[in-house]
Amino acid sequence: MSESLRIIFAGTPDFAARHLDALLSSGHNVVGVFTQPDRPAGRGKKLMPSPIKVLAEEEGLPVFQPVSLRPQENQQLVADLQADVMVVVAYGLILPKAVLEMPRLGCINIHGSLLPRWRGAAPIQRSLWAGDAETGVTIMQMDVGLDTGDMLYKLSCPITAEDTSGTLYDKLAELGPQGLITTLKQLADGTAKPEVQDETLVTYAEKLSKEEARIDWSLSAAQLERCIRAFNPWPMSWLEIEGQPVKVWKASVIDTATNAAPGTILEANKQGIQVATGDGILNLLSLQPAGKKAMSAQDLLNSRREWFVPGNRLV
């Protein structure tokens, strides 16, 4: 194989752990792992380690958990490892310019979109939300900007009509490690060909919020159906009935024109709960009332038919 590189890995969630796992079997030398501090989790608010910390400790790797990389003493932790390259995957901390310049080959990042489209915090969700036909991963050389560095390698995958953010996350978690290993080989061989991002093609993937996930019936049925998939598994599209939030897990579009006001219930039967939108009809197929499990529209109608009387309006 190519030259074995000394690598610092920085990441936090499961998505990052899949990349570290691939690195550990690649023949490269992971000399240290940076991850976020343990966080309170669960009902007992017990301090829990990140998936990266768990994996790194299982493998006997040195683990560092600074709150910030701005203090000089924390930057020294990076310098002391004398790495060839630092691999950053969903780390969650800003890397100051001094840290970016420490490794011989700099720092590289795996981003969950085909840059320059969807720079920012929620690229997987926004690609679905916007109705993109494909997405993928970009491995880029990091600089001080937000996902602005030169692109080193890309892998793409189609977005299907059934994809949710959850399924797309899994697809990209398979692609990312493949792209990472290829990029490291090119960096080691000196064959990497950095490509500058075209600033005219930039879009930004803003963070999601629970309020954005509230169903706005003035939007088109097609847009709402995409939102339902984009916001699954978080924050989940929802509507309010009698003061209670009801999550929507699945819906379909019925391409039939209607003059009914957006939010008007048109039909409620075993085929679903059909609601007028700003353009077309949205057929609600799977819902989850507060405190209950997700269920089919038919099962919900069996217990709460009064919520979905045709002619009534959802707000």
Swiss-Prot record:
GO cellular component: cytosol
EC class of the enzyme, as a word: transferase
Alphabetized GO MF terms: methionyl-tRNA formyltransferase activity
Keywords: Protein biosynthesis, Transferase
InterPro entries: Fmt, Formyl_trans_C, Formyl_trans_C_sf, Formyl_transf_N, Formyl_transf_N_sf, Formyl_transferase-like_C_sf, GART_AS, Met-tRNA-FMT_C
UniProt-annotated binding residues for (6S)-5,6,7,8-tetrahydrofolate: S113, L114, L115, P116
PANTHER family in alphabetical order: METHIONYL-TRNA FORMYLTRANSFERASE, METHIONYL-TRNA FORMYLTRANSFERASE, MITOCHONDRIAL
Annotated function: Attaches a formyl group to the free amino group of methionyl-tRNA(fMet). The formyl group appears to play a dual role in the initiator identity of N-formylmethionyl-tRNA by promoting its recognition by IF2 and preventing the misappropriation of this tRNA by the elongation apparatus.
Name of protein: Methionyl-tRNA formyltransferase
Lineage: Bacteria, Pseudomonadati, Pseudomonadota, Gammaproteobacteria, Enterobacterales
Gene: fmt
